[in-house]
Swiss-Prot record:
This is Gap junction beta-2 protein. GO terms for cellular component: connexin complex; plasma membrane. Signal peptide: none annotated. Structural component of gap junctions. Gap junctions are dodecameric channels that connect the cytoplasm of adjoining cells. They are formed by the docking of two hexameric hemichannels, one from each cell membrane. Small molecules and ions diffuse from one cell to a neighboring cell via the central pore. Ca(2+) binds at residues 42, 45, 47. GO terms for biological process: cell-cell signaling; gap junction assembly; gap junction-mediated intercellular transport; sensory perception of sound. It comes from Ovis aries (Sheep). The lineage of its organism: Eukaryota, Metazoa, Chordata, Craniata, Vertebrata. The gene is GJB2. It is found in: Cell membrane; Cell junction, Gap junction.
Amino acid sequence: MDWSALQTILGGVNKHSTSIGKIWLTVLFIFRIMILVVAAKEVWGDEQADFVCNTLQPGCKNVCYDHYFPISHIRLWALQLIFVSTPALLVAMHVAYYRHEKKRKFIRGEIKTEFKDIEEIKNQKVRIEGSLWWTYTGSIFFRVIFEAAFMYVFYVMYDGFAMQRLVKCNAWPCPNTVDCFVSRPTEKTVFTVFMIAVSGICILLNVTELCYLLIRFCSGKSKKPV
């Protein structure tokens, strides 16, 4: 998967984010996408080929692998990153729509006094207020939901975050209970715990930013005259 397009889009969103949001984006790309692209694929590249079971029964190895690893860690992480990044794309769409409306009004001569030219509209930093505040805050809320949901899925699907060295399988067509051995279990456990820890950090950053936006919103309301 090519992550450069996603990085370009989210980089545009980063211009309109809070300081906490910029830290979140840095953590997302450096500690998650880069690790996933550069390191994790090397560790999980041999997962099915080196999944060995002590039986020659045709199909038994494939069935056992599918039973214990219904979805590859790499693919589930990639899916998680897509879901977590999608709400930020809503902010990018909102900003694009805002600028489009500003350009349309400028061309029609409705806001000639606010901007010198269209280039100034393109370079304008959009403040997180009004309808954009709701879009931005909603995107953070859904990011927290997606992060927590995927952490729960990881824990339930793989029966914890530690990779077992030995698993026992008695699924059909295995003739009896067979022993299957996982390749690089310790290394995979380290990567899994690291990715889960980074997910937890992202949740903490998102919750902090959400609280910051809510406090700023409430303080702004209280300053308005009754």
